[in-house]
Regions:
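Canonical phosphoinositide-binding patch of PH/PH-like domains
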Residues: 75-83
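Coupling/hinge elements of helicase-like and P-loop NTPase modules
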Residues: 102-109
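A broadly used, surface-exposed interaction patch
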Residues: 52-73
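GIY-YIG nuclease catalytic motif and its immediate N-terminal context
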Residues: 1-55, 83-98, 102
Length: 109
């Protein structure tokens, strides 16, 4: 469990081993930080169904990989938002992006 922007996220999980749940919510793509057990967010996104969202096909995947060096250094953390609307998830994503200013998010506010 990790807290980002006041929200509890499950994980971080190694991206290659992550089994995406059939749930909606927010996600953070992360790499290990400089200190033990710390992580740095590269990207925040939202999905109507995590299980339908293959992050290896994301347009920014190659950039994330260039930072991580290998997919074994890419992690994902998720915050499930059952019964959420796309607009609600997008607003939450914008808030996280404005707070953290990750390198590869489109909405840097």
């Amino acid at each position: 469990m990790i807290t980002l922007g006041g929200r509890s996220f499950g994980g971080p999980f190694l991206l290659p081993l992550w089994s995406a749940p059939a749930a909606s919510g927010l996600y953070a793509v992360m790499v290990p930080g400089w200190r033990l057990l710390t992580f740095r967010a590269l990207y925040f996104g939202q999905a109507g169904d995590f299980s339908q969202n293959d992050l290896r096909r994301h347009p920014r995947y190659a950039e994330w990989l260039s930072i991580g060096g290998t997919d074994w250094n890419l992690y994902i953390a998720t915050h499930e938002m059952p019964f959420s609307t796309e607009a609600g998830r997008q607003a939450a994503e914008r808030n996280l992006t404005c707070s953290y200013r990750p390198e590869f998010s489109e909405n840097k506010g």
